[in-house]
């Protein structure tokens, strides 16, 4: 198992390109199953979860064509099996996203209950209830979700999400694209990745409106046609590199991104003392060598502060001037990184869903272990500013969400290297 060794103390300085968003790419890849012709998806990030999704298509009999820029062409007409097997699905929660498209397009699906990060309960019941509202008959047995469309196909439905669910919204929206009649999704997720998926569906000929609000309307169509679509930039990767620059007192320009999808994070970075300038597709952060000020953060569904940036801001507060409270309202069990940061000398108290972080001037390098994707990013950020060497184990978590993290940080002047386990 690979590890990262980071020698702290280098101030980050330079420019990097932001990758395509994993959380947009995965539902968009799943949505290609709805099409009755070849579809090309561009700006895919080089990540394990993306490779797994493409491998899953291969297992189903679809032969994706990938070019050197990691654009992929998918022709779902060659599909031979409607089963998403456990050995692939177990490593990736997003595999549940093929359920809606397969039932809508092919009338049935068998998808293993998913794996992925161990954060909270993240139930799949909203996906199941949404499809049942459209007439699907669903059984969960032997670790598999087995779904069948009614005779004549799925029917449009009004569905209310009793908790906001990004993947739930995406799954039901995809299924509704080919259902008969109108579907209205209420209390829908408003995330930019949901909007990106809706834009992709519309590029194939779907009729989706209201994405980005809490009510999405989908008028089902008979077929979806070929399209080329470029995945949006990754707002969490963008935010992670900006926090890394802030923590080290540095200056970083991130390119091929979108400042409008990151406003809550940029606001908190300004509050921490960062000077931020934005263009249409770039953001520059400059700390002018200053130590950040501690900030209070409360996670909530978009457009509020994203839960996927919570761990990074705990790392920022750990070396900031003052004390900041970080309140997690989305997932339980999402402070696992705190105990690893304690090993580096951080002063953090966890009380229920709140972490109280009192900044200290210097953290100390230590052997630490990544516990999930975003927690691992917080360990990398803390290691960049710690005295001495930090060894981060289990970095396969990082590789699930950050493309070429050590190369990008090296371009900014970080002393970081990957060593085989």
Curated annotation (Swiss-Prot):
GO annotation terms (biological process): cell division; cell wall organization; peptidoglycan biosynthetic process; regulation of cell shape; UDP-N-acetylgalactosamine biosynthetic process
The places in or outside the cell where this protein is found are: Cytoplasm
**Which CDD domains does the protein's record reference?**
UdpNAET
A GO MF term: UDP-N-acetylglucosamine 1-carboxyvinyltransferase activity
Tell me what reaction this enzyme catalyses. Answer: phosphoenolpyruvate + UDP-N-acetyl-alpha-D-glucosamine = UDP-N-acetyl-3-O-(1-carboxyvinyl)-alpha-D-glucosamine + phosphate
Which residues does UDP-N-acetyl-alpha-D-glucosamine bind? 93, 122-126, 308, 330
Residues recorded as binding phosphoenolpyruvate, renumbered to this chain, are 22-23
Q: Which family does it belong to?
A: Belongs to the EPSP synthase family. MurA subfamily.
Instruction: Fetch the HAMAP family from UniProt.
Output: MurA
What's the protein name? Answer: UDP-N-acetylglucosamine 1-carboxyvinyltransferase
| Gene that encodes it | murA
């Amino acid at each position: 198992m690979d590890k990262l060794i980071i020698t702290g103390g280098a101030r980050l300085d330079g420019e990097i390109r932001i990758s395509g968003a994993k959380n947009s790419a995965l539902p968009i890849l799943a949505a290609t199953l709805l099409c009755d012709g070849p579809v090309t998806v561009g700006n895919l990030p080089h990540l394990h979860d993306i490779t797994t999704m493409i491998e899953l298509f291969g297992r189903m009999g679809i032969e994706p064509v990938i070019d050197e820029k990691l654009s992929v062409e998918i022709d779902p007409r060659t599909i031979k099996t409607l089963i998403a097997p456990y050995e692939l699905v177990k490593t990736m929660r997003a595999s549940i996203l093929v359920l809606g498209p397969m039932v809508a397009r092919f009338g049935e699906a068998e998808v293993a209950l998913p794996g992925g990060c161990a954060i909270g309960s993240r139930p799949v019941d909203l996906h199941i209830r949404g499809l049942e509202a459209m007439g699907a008959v669903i059984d969960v047995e032997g670790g598999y979700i087995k779904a069948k469309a009614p005779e004549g196909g799925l029917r449009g439905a009004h569905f209310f999400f009793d908790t906001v669910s990004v993947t739930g919204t995406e799954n039901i929206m995809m299924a509704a694209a080919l259902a008969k009649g109108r579907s209205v999704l209420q209390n829908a997720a408003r995330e930019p990745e949901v909007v990106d998926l809706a834009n992709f569906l519309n590029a194939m000929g779907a009729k989706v409106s209201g994405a980005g609000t809490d009510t999405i309307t989908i008028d089902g169509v008979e077929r979806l046609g070929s399209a080329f679509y470029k995945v949006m930039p990754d707002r969490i990767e963008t935010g992670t590199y900006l926090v890394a620059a802030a923590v080290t007192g540095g200056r970083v320009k991130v390119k091929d991104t979108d400042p409008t999808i990151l406003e809550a994070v940029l606001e908190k970075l300004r509050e921490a003392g960062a000077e931020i300038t934005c263009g249409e597709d770039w953001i520059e952060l400059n700390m002018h060598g200053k130590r950040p000020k501690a900030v209070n953060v409360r996670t909530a569904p978009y457009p509020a502060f994203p839960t996927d940036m919570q761990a990074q801001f705990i790392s920022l507060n750990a070396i900031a001037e003052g004390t900041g409270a970080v309140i997690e309202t989305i997932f339980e069990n999402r402070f696992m990184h705190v105990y690893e940061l304690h090993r580096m000398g951080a002063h953090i108290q966890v009380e229920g869903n709140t972490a109280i972080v009192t900044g200290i001037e210097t953290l100390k390098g230590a052997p630490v272990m990544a516990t999930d994707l975003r927690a691992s990013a917080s360990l990398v950020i803390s290691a960049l500013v710690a005295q001495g060497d930090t060894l981060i184990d289990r970095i396969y978590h990082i590789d699930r969400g950050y493309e070429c993290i050590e190369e990008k940080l090296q371009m900014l002047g970080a002393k970081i290297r990957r060593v085989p386990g």
